Amino acid sequence: GYSSAASDVYKRQALDAYGLPLELRYLPIIESALNPSAVSRAGASGLWQFMIGTGKIYGLESNSLVDERRDPIKATWAAARYLKEMYDIYGDWNLVIAAYNCGPGTINKAIRRANGETDYWKIYNYLPKETRGYVPAFIAANYVMTYYCDHNICPMETNIPASTDTVQVNKNLHFEQIADLCNVPLLS
């Protein structure tokens, strides 16, 4: 399974690799409640809630056999790259976080409607209702995750098991090949 401590390690690695603030590791709290199997009404999936098209742009395969949007590690690296590219465009973390929620097209439209303003709080009224609450929710999640001890909140170690599926194999395969393809050690 994926423990919260383990998930924090790969999130930190991906964010560090792209020079991103470590606070972004809390974005999946808002996106999916840290559930790698979460699916939204709109069809977004996984820890980072990628739509199929966006996932494909960032190298996440999604077909009848596999949905890499639900792979916490691959999706985290894809999300880090996406967040970096949006920061290169907007240069403002509030806008980046809002764009992660509603898409850059919606942010660009809000900026146009706000006469070119690029301050999140000045385009706030031009954003979808869900996105208006998204940035404050992210700020709140960061506060709670940083200052939980000051409020007598005790963290609990969670261990959400990885989702599994059955795949039919039509050819002979050695366990070494399967282990190699799945990138897991072969137990002796």
Residue ranges and their predicted role:
Residues 29-34, 47-60, 102-106, 144-147:
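Glycine-rich, acidic and aromatic/proline-enriched surface loops and short helix-turn segments
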Residues 156-188:
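Primarily a LysM-type cell-wall glycan-binding module
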Residues 20-37, 96-103, 142:
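Short, functionally critical alpha-helical segments immediately adjacent to catalytic or ligand/cofactor-binding
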Residues 1-6, 10:
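Single conserved hydrophobic/aromatic residue that forms the stacking wall/gate
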Residues 129-151:
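Catalytic cores of secreted or luminal carbohydrate-active enzymes
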Residues 34-41, 49-91, 111-125:
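Substrate-binding clefts and substrate-entry loops adjacent to catalytic sites
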Residues 19-25, 29, 42-45, 93, ...:
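Extracytoplasmic
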Residues 53, 57, 74-85, 95, ...:
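Extracytoplasmic/secreted proteins, especially bacterial periplasmic and envelope-associated proteins
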